[in-house]
Amino acid sequence: MNTLQTKNVALVAGASGIVGRQLVNTLLQNDWEVIGLSRNPSPHLQNLPVVTVDLRDAGQAARALQPLTHVTHIFYSAWLNAANWAEMVEPNVTMLRNLVSSIDTVASLKTVSLMQGYKVYGAHLGPFKTPARESDPGVAGAEFNAAQLTWLSDYQLGRLWRWNAVRPGVVGSNVPGNTMNLALSIALYASLCQSLNLPLRFPGSPQTWGSIVDFTDAGLLADATLWAATSPAASNQAFNVNNGDVWRWAELWPLIARWFEIECAPPVRVSFERMFKDYRSVWRELALSKRLAESDILKLNDGQFADFVFRWDYDMFGDGSKLRRAGFRGMQATDEMFFRLFRQFRAARIIP
């Protein structure tokens, strides 16, 4: 345990995800030493020191993490899926516990940052109080984000390091190959509609069309996460992190259609997952004719998270003012975020 260490050393769990990859880039740009953590080798982490470990196994975690005596900050954005919300609790709390307790034993920790989301407010269950605030009471029912924070805050008592939790809205990212990338799902859908001479029909219900939603740019989220990890004002606090604006799909969707130069059409329920499977051969032909980087649309995005989002027929937004009052000043116009991501997808030959 090096108590004289001055350089910040980040251990990032979930480094290959849409949140983790941007966070790694931001940390490196700010002269941090970064170590990735992964259950399986990832091609996205080739230029990063990586510890491969299954955090569900306490013994394996302790052995694999024992050499990391120089780690100062843990950034935790990993998660394990399961058949239902209740079954997600035990493995996800176990993974966090095995990581934090192992590093706490060997290193002089400063901060543990936990990535959460609006599920702590019951957003996944149905209509909930909006804007959601960090001071809102908990929600009955098993949910791993809340269970993780309960464990972390209890474990930290009496220790010198501090924790923080960040709670983004729907994250906007340029990372392909991840189901959680809504912007890419929309871009693929729009590209298919364009190639089939179809209008860009809103894929949700009329209620979803009129609902309010907020978003979080991955770069802004990384900046806020770094700020929270290094600011005394964030000690043992949770923060909603959003772009600072809210939108109705009825306002945003026509702007997206205009960007793709497609006619906008009224809501009809469309499953992105079903469409991407049904039009897999259409995408393959489009990719070949336009010389796109990936000819298999399902390797880019499976549409499942998009279907989840477009089933929200209720408002989904949080109050981001606590973060700004504490000292973080970042903002992002959501429409411009989407347009920038679409340009990046096009530049990378992901969409035509």
Protein language model annotation of sequence segments:
Residues 13, 173, 204-211, 239-246, ...:
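Glycine-rich Rossmann NAD(P)(H)-binding loop
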Residues 222-307, 319-321, 325, 342-349:
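Mid/C-terminal beta-alpha module of Rossmann-like enzyme folds, strongest
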Residues 188-216:
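A conserved pocket-lining segment of Rossmann-fold NAD(P)-dependent short-chain dehydrogenase/reductase
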Residues 138-169, 174:
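Active-site Tyr-X1-5-Lys
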Residues 2-30:
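N-terminal Rossmann NAD(P)H-binding glycine-rich loop of SDR-like oxidoreductase domains
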Residues 159, 171-189, 219, 227-239, ...:
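Glycine/proline-rich active-site loop of Rossmann-fold NAD(P)-dependent oxidoreductases
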Residues 42-98:
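NAD(P)H-binding glycine-rich loop region in Rossmannoid oxidoreductase-like domains
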Residues 74-76, 94-144, 164:
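Conserved Rossmann-fold NAD(P)-dependent oxidoreductase catalytic core, especially the SDR/UDP-sugar
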